């Protein structure tokens, strides 16, 4: 079993969530009582990963600080006997988990962001998890499905893995996947035959699959990233590098289990907030009642 590191690219400026993200990193926007990035780290840790690399930007100090120890806050909570809150704060970065930071100086695309992590990851296989797509842990056990299953399959086969989901409507804003065989059941796997970032004419592709921001990548991806020219929006795209890799070796797509929310966009963020809010143990029942009252006004 390989000791894989996970890379989370958090250097993006969160354009879809402006003006909220003008001064607050998108990844720190709360979903009930935890910032978005915390759900991502929790998912990675549940998959058995102990080393996480955040690719940050000068404006993302809040993300770095979130995972640092706050001795003053912990001391205050201890003095006030807020044991539950203290435990929650201390578990933000679980024991045995290391979170490192590297900087992306220029916004040259997701592929470039991943390359910025290479000095820390080394010429080794690794994981990429995008910070704004949250997989609902109530609909899929993170200890068994999705990223955890992708890691297990990579350890078994050595083949790169990409998580996919079905998407209705316009796919021109997404990374579209076409597979050799149909993915007709959650967790099913098939080889990728085409992978296109934000296709101009998605209707010409015989596919309704899009990438869900989870990748387990073989070490061969590094060479492809180095060779990748700027693509969609003039950026170096991870999708383009994976597409080239898929021409040379098998790259698998795995159909996602459960539900996901694109919290980098307003609708997905609002859906996730409501879903997690309704499940909140302390306030969920009152929140549900409040929503029902609003809907009947």
From Swiss-Prot:
Its EC number is 2.7.7.9. The keyword Nucleotidyltransferase applies. One of its GO terms (molecular function) is UTP:glucose-1-phosphate uridylyltransferase activity. The keyword Thylakoid does not apply. Pathway: Carbohydrate metabolism; nucleotide-sugar metabolism; Bacterial outer membrane biogenesis; lipopolysaccharide biosynthesis. InterPro entries: GalF, GalU_uridylyltTrfase_bac/arc, NTP_transferase_dom, Nucleotide-diphossugar_trans. It comes from the Bacteria. Keywords: Lipopolysaccharide biosynthesis, Nucleotidyltransferase, Transferase. This is UTP--glucose-1-phosphate uridylyltransferase. The gene is galF.
């Amino acid at each position: 079993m390989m000791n894989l590191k996970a890379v989370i690219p958090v250097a993006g400026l969160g354009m879809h969530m402006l003006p909220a993200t003008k001064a607050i990193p998108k990844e720190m926007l709360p979903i009930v009582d935890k910032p978005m990035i915390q759900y991502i780290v929790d998912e990675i840790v549940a998959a058995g990963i102990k080393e996480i690399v955040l690719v940050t930007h000068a404006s993302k100090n809040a993300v770095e600080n979130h995972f640092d120890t706050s001795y003053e806050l912990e001391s205050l909570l201890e003095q006030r006997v807020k044991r539950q809150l203290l435990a929650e704060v201390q578990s933000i970065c679980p024991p045995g988990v290391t979170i490192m930071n590297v900087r992306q100086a220029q916004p040259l695309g997701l592929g470039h962001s991943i390359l910025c992590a290479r000095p820390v990851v080394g010429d080794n296989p690794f994981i990429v998890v995008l910070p704004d797509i949250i997989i609902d842990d109530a609909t899929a056990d993170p200890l068994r499905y999705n990223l955890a299953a992708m890691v297990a399959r990579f350890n078994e086969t050595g083949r790169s893995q990409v998580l996919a989901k079905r998407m209705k409507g316009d796919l021109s804003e997404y990374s579209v996947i076409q597979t050799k065989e149909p993915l007709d059941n959650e967790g099913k796997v098939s080889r990728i035959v085409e992978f296109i970032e934000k296709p101009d004419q998605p209707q010409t592709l015989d596919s309704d699959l899009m990438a869900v921001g989870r990748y387990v990548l073989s070490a061969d991806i590094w060479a492809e990233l180095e060779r990748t020219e700027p693509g969609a929006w003039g950026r170096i795209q991870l999708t383009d590098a994976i597409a080239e890799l898929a021409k040379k070796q098998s790259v698998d797509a795995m159909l996602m289990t459960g539900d996901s929310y694109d919290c980098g966009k307003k609708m997905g963020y609002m859906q996730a907030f409501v879903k997690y809010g309704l499940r909140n143990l302390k306030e969920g029942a009152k929140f549900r009642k409040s929503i029902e009252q609003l809907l009947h006004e």
